[in-house]
Structure formats: C-alpha cells, structure tokens
C-alpha cells in the first residue's frame, strides 16, 4: 500500500488520519492511520496483546482470548460506544487472522453488529523512521443507529484508539536519544 507524499508528511508531523465513507445498506467505512516511533515488532506486540487491550485502549471494557489455533484467534470484547447522552455497551466475538508483523484481519462472528470486519496493517520502510499502523473497517450495528451517528462516533473515537496503540508500542520500545 503506497501512501501519497502529502499523507506521509502529515503522518510525520504527528497527525492522526481518519477518513470515513458511507457504503450501501447503511454500512460505514472507516480508515485510520498513525505513525508510531517504534519498530514494527513493538507495534505488533501492542496490537496483539489481546487479553490486555482493556487496559490500553479507550472504551474497551473487557478483552479476552477465547481460543487460539495457529494464526487464528477467537476474541471476546466488550466496549462502550456512543456520544453525548447516547452511550451503549456492545459485546462481540471476533475471528482474527494474524499475518505476523504485517496484518491482523478481523470479522465479527457473533455480537451487536450486523457488519464488523476489517484489518489492522503494519508497514515499515527504509525511507521512514517508525511504523505506520493503518486501520480499515466496515461497520453496521444491529441496534438502531443512523450511519451519520456511527460515522461521527468513529471519527471521534478512532484517533484515541490509534494514539493509544502508539503510546503502548512506544512505551514497549523507548527510542534511545
């Protein structure tokens, strides 16, 4: 996945990038990116510490591995979602497929969404110090929530989630000055 130079410049300046799109059938597409000042191994460790995500990620109340078979993980999570007066607890089970140091794909197998699937992608390159962590997902809750509300919640929450992964990865591998 090749980034445009303006996107790379924005990431290097510390921006957290979030992009939203409305798809057919009220599905919201979310893309997010952040540059993390840590080696890809540390970003991987932060991203895949599934049993402790509730300690590092905002709005994740519980997170636990149900089963692991090779590169496939079944993960139960509980989170809080919403804005202003509307806050809801959501529960879901995800099937994760790991490609070591490259990607974690996920799809809900049961829970409070009719559509919840996507991937986390890790990318490093010689011309760039650090690791780019990207998030791509398609989301549609089972409960009533207009797409504009879903998109606003994602736009509001995604930067905090990306920054939390950044903070955790950078704490695991502090940069020596």
Roles of regions detected by a PLM:
Residues 36-40, 50, 79-83, 98-100, ...:
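Beta-strand elements of well-folded, non-transmembrane domains
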Residues 23, 54, 64-110, 163-176:
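Glycine-rich portal/gate segments that line the openings of hydrophobic small-molecule binding cavities
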Residues 1-70:
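Hydrophobic ligand-binding cavity/cleft-lining segments
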Residues 31-34, 63-65, 91-96, 117-124:
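Hydrophobic/aromatic beta-strand elements that line small-molecule binding cavities or substrate pockets
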Residues 107-156:
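Beta-strand/loop substructures that line and gate deep hydrophobic ligand-binding cavities in soluble
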């Amino acid at each position: 996945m090749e980034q445009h130079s303006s996107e790379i410049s924005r990431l290097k300046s510390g921006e957290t990038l979030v992009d939203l799109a409305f798809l057919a059938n009220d599905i919201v597409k979310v893309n997010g990116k952040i540059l993390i000042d840590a080696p890809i191994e540390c970003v991987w460790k932060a991203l895949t510490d599934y049993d402790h995500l509730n300690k590092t990620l905002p709005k994740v109340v519980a997170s636990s591995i149900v089963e692991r078979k090779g590169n496939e993980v079944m993960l139960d999570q509980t989170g809080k979602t919403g804005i202003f007066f509307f806050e809801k607890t959501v529960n879901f089970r995800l099937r994760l497929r790991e490609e070591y140091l490259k990607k974690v794909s996920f799809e809900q197998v049961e829970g409070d969404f009719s559509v919840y699937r996507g991937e986390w992608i890790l990318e490093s390159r010689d011309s760039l110090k650090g690791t780019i962590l990207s998030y791509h997902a398609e989301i549609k809750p089972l409960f009533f929530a207009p797409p504009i509300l879903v998109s606003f919640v994602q736009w509001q929450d995604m930067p905090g989630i990306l920054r939390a992964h950044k903070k955790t990865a950078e704490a695991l591998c502090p940069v020596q000055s």
